[in-house]
A protein has these predicted regions:
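Bacterial N-terminal signal peptides that target proteins for export
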Residues: 1-12
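Sec/Tat signal peptide C-region and signal peptidase I cleavage site
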Residues: 23-30
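Short, glycine-/small- and polar/acidic-enriched structural segments
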Residues: 30-172, 182, 186-192, 208-209
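Short, solvent-exposed loop/beta-turn-alpha elements that line the ligand-binding surface or hinge
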Residues: 60, 211-218, 282-289, 311
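Pocket-lining segment of extracytoplasmic ligand-binding domains
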Residues: 93-94, 172-263
């Protein structure tokens, strides 16, 4: 059940009633008049094909999803917070930001996506241990969660970052790809499927030693499913949605050919690159609350909060709806498990 994060975003936000066809339809679809609309906000990324392709499964639960394109986690949080949508994706650093802003009407109700952002190195530049990064020229996009995870992972692994030539790079992709190819960078941090293009085109590799999401403290969490509390007031609807959400995630996880066809259609990504991306990330409806708390402690250092908001982060998770939908306990759902 694997997949990946951030592709080139669309230049404008637009509302899309998802109409991509996958050649598959769920049995027992509800009558048209019985279908309820749930609005979602997502980036055009690889993090949630099971929401872009939700309707073929959701309709047997009497639900359809309409997607509002958004570029950043902040955009998506704002759409949920203002009631423009019922649900959407946010990042693992988002609960800390919401706590500092005293946001009262958004709760995280499920997991979504793990991995999909990492360090990629140029072929010929050998990296066997984290310490080998010292002396290398590494591109890091400032203000991004991928950049934060790299810094935290490097520190956990005793890298002296003062001995690393860190270059501020863009989150766009093409300039970084060219810089790596030309030898202007030894490596850079970004998200899939941009970094997977490097592997497929043969001039870069994932260093086995140095997965930025492999630390116990901070993990590889990427995207979470959040909801407006007005939507959650209808508990039956919210639980039903989560049942369909889990089933859709499971379906696309077990049918990678359909996933790749779907993602290629709405992102324009090539099948080989998407296949590579799927090796380095995964979907899960479970979350890791402790990772989010640990990340929140680092907020002041990286500037995504002014103060340490870690003591309030757990209050932004309400996994009781997911527990009812799955039959698992809140405690089970609050960690990735073995």
């Amino acid at each position: 059940m694997k997949i990946a994060r951030h592709l080139a975003p669309s230049s404008i936000a637009l509302t899309l009633t998802f109409a991509l066809t996958t050649g598959w339809h769920a049995p027992g679809r509800a009558a048209e008049g019985d279908v309820k609309l749930v609005r979602a906000t997502l980036s055009r990324s690889l993090s949630a094909p099971f929401l872009w392709g939700f309707n073929s499964i959701g309709e047997k639960y009497g639900l359809r999803v309409q997607v509002l394109d958004a570029i950043t986690n902040a955009d998506q949080q704002r759409n949920i917070q203002t009631g423009g949508v019922e649900i959407g994706s946010v990042g693992y650093q988002s609960p800390a930001g919401m706590a500092e802003q005293n946001v009262q009407n958004v709760k995280i109700i499920a997991g979504m996506y793990v991995g999909g952002q990492n360090l990629i190195m140029r072929k010929g530049v050998e990296l066997k241990t984290w310490k080998d990064i010292e002396g290398k020229k590494i591109g890091r996009p400032p203000g991004t969660y991928a950049g934060i995870l790299f810094t935290l992972a490097a520190q956990v692994n005793d890298v002296d970052l003062s001995r690393v030539s860190l270059v501020n790079t863009t989150p766009a992709g093409p300039p970084e790809l060219q810089a790596l190819k030309n030898g202007d960078l030894d490596g850079f941090i970004l998200w899939s499927p941009i970094i997977d293009r490097v592997v497929i085109e043969g001039y870069g590799y994932y260093p086995a030693c140095c997965d930025i999401g492999a630390t116990k403290e901070f993990g590889a969490g990427n995207q979470l499913l959040a909801a407006n509390t007005d939507f959650l007031k209808d508990r039956k609807l919210a639980v039903t949605f989560l049942k369909a959400y889990v089933e859709s995630m499971d379906f696309y996880g077990k049918n990678p050919d359909k996933t790749i066809a779907l993602v290629a259609e709405y992102t324009g990504g090539g099948a080989a690159i998407l296949n590579e991306a799927m090796k380095h990330s995964r979907w899960t409806y479970r979350v890791n609350v402790q990772n989010a708390i640990n990340v929140a402690k680092e907020g002041p250092k990286f500037g995504f909060t002014k103060a340490d908001m870690s003591g309030k982060v757990a209050d932004y998770f309400d996994l009781s709806y997911l527990a009812e939908a799955t039959g698992q306990s809140v405690e089970q759902l609050g960690s990735y498990g073995p």
